[in-house]
Amino acid sequence: MGHEYYQLKQNFLGAQKTGFPFGGLFELSAAATLSAASSQTDKYSIESYLSRINYNFGEKYYVSGSFRTDGSSRFYRDSRWGQFWSLGASWRVSQENFMQSVNWINNLTLKASFGSQGNDNIGSFYAYQSLYTLLANGSFNGAGINSLENKDLKWEKNENLNIGIEARLFDRLSLTAEFFNKHTKDLLLNMPKATSTGFDSYPANVGSMRNIGVDITASVEIFKGSAFEWTLTAMASHIRNKILKLADKPEIISGSNIFREGEAVNSFYLPVSAGVDPLTGNQLYWVDRDKNNKIVPRYKTDDVTLTTNSREVVGNRIPDLYGSLTNDFRYKGFDLSILTTYSIGGEMLDGVYGSMMNVGYKGYVWHKNALRRWQKPGDITDVPKIMWDQQIRVTDQDLINASYFAIKNITLGYSLSKKWLQKIKMENIRVYATADNIALFTHLKGMDPQYNFTGTVGYTYAPTKTFSLGIDIKF
């Protein structure tokens, strides 16, 4: 049994004044004119009551169960509390009598669990309330509503089914495999709204989606001697996502992304490029609607206005396979660890590259690939001609393979031998050097595909390389 209470309170106060009598003064009271003043207070709290029970029978059969109820200040009082539970069981097959003669299996465990979890992260502390902003207009002050309330907002609930196996073979190879099926109900998202209402969206529970996948971990002790050890650990995950149901309408379009029933979350929704017209140098698009928005057989056009209603789902960020490889080496007092990560499949939309290829505007930094632009009739290229104030749509051609391989961490350490530790009466002394974010191999140039869920890359920095030295001392 347990109880938790968490509260966050943020206070902000800012002011600006001008007209100091002379330099070197830092107190606002010394200035003559108040230029700006603002303040803000945010509060968020969550309270939880929880319980858990575990049962072990004969070191073979294990059963566990949990129940909790959580209350969040982000929801209206009628739907503030959510109830969540889980049940799990495991069977150590290797402990059964019929397995005692199988010497090469050190451990074999089957396990399964089912349960639910809650999520209240809607991106706002006051999602169920209608907020207003105080504004100045001329010489008068007033208040304007800047968000819509939704008192029906409630917890997002995740129901998880996990089935797995753990094994230790030949006292050298460890294997773990787990299948998971995660069903998310009452998704918390901002629902788009007609801008004629004065608001572009409002927070809502918009539907449900499912994630199905497999996680596999294998660790093998390649060399296992008294002086030298080498252990290789490989992790691989595969996941498939599908939106099952959306409230009110079958799709939600947000910029270059779409939430559509039957598709993966944050799928790319873009016009399809038909290349560059070799006669005119204009960007061509595949469309299936005419100027009256009627469906017609697919054809090519350079009329960018027709692409709005002819966009297609052309991919998503979710990789086919992702994971890591870790090599651990030990030789006498030295230890070396090398961590690498990888991702195979999925696409990303590189907005930075796209802006540098939009060669129709002056004053922009152009990418070197703009040199491939169309220049005269008959040129075959994928970059349209330079034309002042031309409108070019982002298309599937701007998607980039998001696969990557990264050397994330290398750590080299040395631990003093027990002989020396006994002399100085210390338990352990280890010195080490660490390097993080060493190298990244990817189709993206300068940006990092590892830390983005939507698949859209903006003006963000890639993780910096970090080098550090340290010492661990235990008395």
Where are these predicted regions, by residue range?
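Surface-exposed loop/turn segments flanking beta-strands in extracellular/periplasmic regions
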Residues: 9-39, 124-149, 195-202, 253-264, ...
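Outer-membrane beta-barrel and related beta-rich outer-membrane complex signature
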Residues: 5-21, 75-79, 101-103, 116-130, ...
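Surface-exposed extracellular loop regions of Gram-negative outer-membrane beta-barrel proteins
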Residues: 1, 44-76, 80-95, 158-159, ...
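Short loop/turn motifs that connect adjacent beta-strands in outer-membrane beta-barrel proteins
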Residues: 60, 94-108, 172, 223-230, ...
